[in-house]
C-alpha cells in the first residue's frame, strides 16, 4: 500500500506543478489583457459569469459545479488583482 500511496502522491505533485504553471500563464495573460483594456474597467462580471458557465458545462466531475465555481472565482480574482496592479502602476507612471 505504501508504494501505491507514494505513487499516487507523486502523481498529485506532478499535477500540482502543471496546474501552477498553467495558472501562472493565465496570470501573465491577465496582465497583458490589463494593458490592452482601453476603458480602464478591470472587473466585468458578465465575462466572469461567461467563463464559469463554460467551465461548468465542461465539468465531468468528480468535483461539483460549486467546487469548480469556487476554485475559478479565486483564480479569476487573483488574476484580476494582477490587472489592477498593472493599471494603477500605468496610471501613476503616466501622470
Regions found by a protein language model. Give the residues of each.
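Domain-level signature for soluble enzymes in the chorismate/prephenate branch of the shikimate pathway
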Residues: 1-95
Amino acid at each position: 500500500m505504501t508504494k501505491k500511496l507514494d505513487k499516487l502522491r507523486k502523481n498529485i505533485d506532478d499535477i500540482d506543478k502543471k496546474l501552477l504553471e498553467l495558472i501562472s500563464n493565465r496570470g501573465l495573460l491577465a496582465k497583458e489583457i490589463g494593458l490592452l483594456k482601453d476603458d480602464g474597467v478591470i472587473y466585468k462580471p458578465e465575462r466572469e459569469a461567461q467563463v464559469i458557465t463554460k467551465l461548468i458545462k465542461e465539468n465531468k466531475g468528480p468535483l461539483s459545479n460549486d467546487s469548480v465555481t469556487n476554485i475559478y472565482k479565486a483564480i479569476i480574482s487573483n488574476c484580476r488583482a494582477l490587472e489592477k496592479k498593472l493599471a494603477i502602476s500605468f496610471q501613476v507612471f503616466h501622470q
